[in-house]
């Protein structure tokens, strides 16, 4: 190889530039502390460093988010703890109010304190931190509760990111706080009529008032009710073997809803010598109790009221109603004549009761126990006796029946909805079978019905409209048809099908199948009549199809009705009708199953005759709820405050509000409410611990990732200095060599 000056020069320049580049790179490493400045310098180092940088940023974001979430959970826990303390204080005050020594003035003072405690609970529920409301769900900018406990947030949790693809909730929605059901609680219901020993005339001798127990006999409950003039002797006619009377049995009607959601009706004869414990065992059997298995507990409280407890936790379907009818003579003489005539004919007093009930249920009554023929005339041994019926109520409510009269104990769901301001609402929650969730507008009636089918089910809808008109509407759920008398020609009937939009056309209708009818559709129908926006001619379906003109007419009528009247399912699954243009309303609504007043027909025996009950109940003179899985904290507290003001120890059928469970019921319910909030505090504590653990773990991970990143990208100063010295030495040697070679000439070799 020929070595020329040009080659030497090229090699010298190349070596010099390489050395300078190495020196520059090492200088950059020493000044910046990292191995590379650009991705092309070392692709593997760059990729690893970028990945670790991303992980560090993610961990930093998680740390910041969990710090913020921790602050929110801490504030939420403090608010919940304070709420539990307030509920405990509330219970102490109610216990104090329940003392017999309190005057009305002292109860009013206690009620004011309870009102302040309730207001404090609402204020805690409206706690905000840094402009965010703790219990508003995901709508943290909106105040969640008003003073009445109405909720304006949502049911959503807020989640904090705790890692790649992982989240953790860190709030309790206000819905859960004030309304969510507790699956570990049982439903407990009660009558509100106290059973007393009526062998004495308690109007004349109120000091002899004595509440009955399970050991008491049925004849003690009827007492002077066997005759109209209260002339019976409490000892001779009831107790002494040689003189006690052979009183007629009582017909007891019971209806209700079992724990599994099915309904029933029954009729049975109760003998005068039967104990109330016998009657309660019979009631338990109607709900499904057997000698080896109980599904409900039927008992009597200290005020002589029957209480029924569902033994399965989380169930929310249990319901009860009962009324009894006993043949009543004018006086003791007539009663003895009836007894003697029965003996002469060779019949029992059970036969006498059956004859009385057969006449009471005959024309024009047609089997409706809410409107019995009374008095009735029956024949015994050829003699005619005019006999009255003594009614024994189990439950009383200050409602109005569908005839416009005040309800009595025989009325069940033939009542108008309750009214509050510009809203009327049913008092029976529609509960989905299986899930125990409240029905919404989209819920199908078939998901709630007590039976297995809607075949033969007809609803009676009575409406006194916003415009002052009255409508008597029949909703046939089997045929999906609504019919009513023509307001302009009552002898003619107008009808239209229950329909929904035809998905194929979008501008015509399809008849909704029986099992697909929703509460929203029923509510729309109610709205039409409440707002006086009804079809004036019959609408016919053709092979299940509704043409465009008829469909458009119905849709426009519904739209017009919704401008003045809102009908929907409220937060407790009840049908609610609101008059939008008024602070009060003259609208009245009644909705009931057409078969609700019909019971098994006589003759009756001492063994219950049982048949299926109605598929639906929307508003009813039914049992009172002492406790249930669902809560409604503010409304519950309002009811308790009212009980304190009225001085009601227990539910009282004669009080201003007979459906209030009283202070004893309040104390039992308060234990549930406090436990409900405590469990949510525990849940929040679990959220806090999870987030705190993530926060701590993130801090450690950040250190570890930073250490790994340092190993990947950070320069080793010792190694860099050695490389610098070596490079400098090599560079200097290169320069020296280049200089020496450049100075050489041919003369050096001559």
What are these regions (language model features)?
Residues 1, 9-10, 17-20, 24-27, ...:
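Bacterial flagellar/type III secretion structural subunits and associated motility module proteins
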Residues 1-148, 160, 166-173, 274, ...:
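Amphipathic alpha-helical polymerization modules
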């Amino acid at each position: 190889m020929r070595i020329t000056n040009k080659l030497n020069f090229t090699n010298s320049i190349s070596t010099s530039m390489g050395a300078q580049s190495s020196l520059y790179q090492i200088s950059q490493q020493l000044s910046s502390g990292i191995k590379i400045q650009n991705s092309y310098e070392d692709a593997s180092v760059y990729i690893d460093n970028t990945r670790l940088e991303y992980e560090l940023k993610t961990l930093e974001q998680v740390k910041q988010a969990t710090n913020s979430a921790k602050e929110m959970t801490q504030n939420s826990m403090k608010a919940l703890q304070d709420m539990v303390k307030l509920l405990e204080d509330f219970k102490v005050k109610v216990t104090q109010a329940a003392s017999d020594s309190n005057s009305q003035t002292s109860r009013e003072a206690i009620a004011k304190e309870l009102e302040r405690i309730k207001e404090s609970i609402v204020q805690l529920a409206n706690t905000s931190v840094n402009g965010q409301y703790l219990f508003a769900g995901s709508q943290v900018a909106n105040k969640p509760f008003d003073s009445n406990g109405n909720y304006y947030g949502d049911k959503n949790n807020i989640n904090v990111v705790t890692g790649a693809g992982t989240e953790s909730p860190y709030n309790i929605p206000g819905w859960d706080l004030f309304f969510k059901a507790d699956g570990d609680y049982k439903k407990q219901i009660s009558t509100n009529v106290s059973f007393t020993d009526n062998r004495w005339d308690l109007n004349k001798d109120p000091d002899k008032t004595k509440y009955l127990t399970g050991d008491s006999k049925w004849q003690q409950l009827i007492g002077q009710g066997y005759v109209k003039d209260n002339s019976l002797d409490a000892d001779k006619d009831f107790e002494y073997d040689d003189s006690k009377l052979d009183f007629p049995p009582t017909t007891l009607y019971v209806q209700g809803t079992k724990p599994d959601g099915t309904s029933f009706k029954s009729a049975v004869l109760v003998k005068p010598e039967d104990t109330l414990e016998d009657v309660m065992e019979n009631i338990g059997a109607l709900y499904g109790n057997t000698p080896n298995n109980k599904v409900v507990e039927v008992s009597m409280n200290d005020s002589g009221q029957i209480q029924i407890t569902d033994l399965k936790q989380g169930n929310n379907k249990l319901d009860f109603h009962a009324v009894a009818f006993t043949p009543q003579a004018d006086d003791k003489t007539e009663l003895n004549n009836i007894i003697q005539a029965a003996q002469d004919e060779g019949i029992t007093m059970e036969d006498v009761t059956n004859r009385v009930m057969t006449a009471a249920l005959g024309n024009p009554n047609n089997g409706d126990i809410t409107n019995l023929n009374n008095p009735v005339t029956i024949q015994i041994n050829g003699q005619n006796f005019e006999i009255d019926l003594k009614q024994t109520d189990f439950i009383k409510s200050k409602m109005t029946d569908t005839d416009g009269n005040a309800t009595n104990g025989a009325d069940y769901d033939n009542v108008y909805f309750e009214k509050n301001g510009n809203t009327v609402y049913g008092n029976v929650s529609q509960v989905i079978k299986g899930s125990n969730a409240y029905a919404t507008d989209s819920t199908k009636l078939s998901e709630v019905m007590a039976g297995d089918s809607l075949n033969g089910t007809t609803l009676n809808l009575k409406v006194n409209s916003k415009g002052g008109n009255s409508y008597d509407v029949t909703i046939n759920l089997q045929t999906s048809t609504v019919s009513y008398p023509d307001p302009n020609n009552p002898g003619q009937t107008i009808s239209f099908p229950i329909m929904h939009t035809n998905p194929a056309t979008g501008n015509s209708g399809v008849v909704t199948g029986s099992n697909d009818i929703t509460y929203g559709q029923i509510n729309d129908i109610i709205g039409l009549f409440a707002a006086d926006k009804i079809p004036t001619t019959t609408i016919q379906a053709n092979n299940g199809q509704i043409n465009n003109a008829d469909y458009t007419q119905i849709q426009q009528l519904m739209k017009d009705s919704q401008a003045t009247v809102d009908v929907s399912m409220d937060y407790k699954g009840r049908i609610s009708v609101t008059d939008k243009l008024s602070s009060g309303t003259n609208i009245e609504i009644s909705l009931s199953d057409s078969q609700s007043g019909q019971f098994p027909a006589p003759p009756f025996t001492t063994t219950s005759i049982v048949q299926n009950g109605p598929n639906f109940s929307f508003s009813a003179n039914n049992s009172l709820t002492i406790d249930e899985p669902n809560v409604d904290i503010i409304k519950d507290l309002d009811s308790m405050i009212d009980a304190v003001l009225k001085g009601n120890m227990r539910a009282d059928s004669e009080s201003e509000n007979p459906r209030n469970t009283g202070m004893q019921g309040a104390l039992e319910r308060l234990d549930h409410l406090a436990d409900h909030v405590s469990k949510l505090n525990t849940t929040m504590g679990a959220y806090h611990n999870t987030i705190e653990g993530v926060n701590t773990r993130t801090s450690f991970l950040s250190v570890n990732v930073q250490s790994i990143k340092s190993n990947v990208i950070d320069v080793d100063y010792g190694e860099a200095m050695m490389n610098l010295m070596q490079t400098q030495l090599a560079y200097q040697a290169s320069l020296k060599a280049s200089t020496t070679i450049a100075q050489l000439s041919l003369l050096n070799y001559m």
